[in-house]
């Protein structure tokens, strides 16, 4: 049961009805015995700033941010990140973090990475991999991933990307 003491975390995106995050996060909160709740909110781009300020004023703990709001979240938050997927509401303002590229810490340093996409997630990987070749669906498509040892797919395209992969290439395929 949600009470006045319950800490609430939001997922902000457009669309978000398909997201499994609320089910996963609420199960994790329950397993840890936390009085926390997680809910998804479908927020259109023109309402994003108002939604974030409303959540902060309502004493939400924070929010996860997904498509198409990661760049706007970075502009609102106290951060140097170009793209933000996590907002923490604090007494002194809104702190922003990006966890998108954290998976890179588990891999060997790539020598020839390729990033597919030009949104917030792709920007987070571009900051972590400044030497990467970048392909966006608006221009350089289909992508040339030949010679890449790491392919980061930050698009909704799957079949074309998978068809272009060869032996020895690592794929990070993001939803």
Predicted regions: what they are:
Residues 35-39, 133, 170:
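Conserved beta-strand segments of alpha/beta enzyme cores
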Residues 140-175:
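Rossmann-like adenosine-cofactor binding region
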């Amino acid at each position: 049961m949600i009470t006045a003491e319950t800490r609430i975390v939001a997922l902000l995106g457009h669309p978000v009805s398909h997201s499994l995050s609320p089910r996963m996060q609420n199960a994790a909160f329950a397993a840890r015995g936390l009085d926390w709740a997680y809910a998804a909110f479908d927020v259109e781009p023109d309402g994003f700033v108002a939604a974030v300020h409303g959540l902060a004023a309502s004493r939400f703990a924070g929010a996860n941010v997904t498509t198409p709001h990661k760049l706007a979240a970075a502009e609102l938050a106290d951060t140097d990140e170009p793209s933000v997927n996590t907002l923490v509401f604090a007494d002194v303002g809104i702190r922003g973090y990006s966890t998108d590229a954290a998976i890179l810490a588990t891999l060997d340093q790539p020598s020839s990475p390729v990033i597919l996409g030009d949104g917030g997630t792709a920007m987070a990987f571009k900051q972590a991999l400044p030497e990467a070749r970048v392909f966006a669906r608006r221009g350089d498509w289909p992508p040339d991933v030949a010679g890449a040892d790491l392919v980061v797919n930050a698009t909704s395209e799957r079949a074309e990307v998978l068809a272009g992969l060869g032996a020895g290439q690592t794929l990070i395929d993001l939803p």
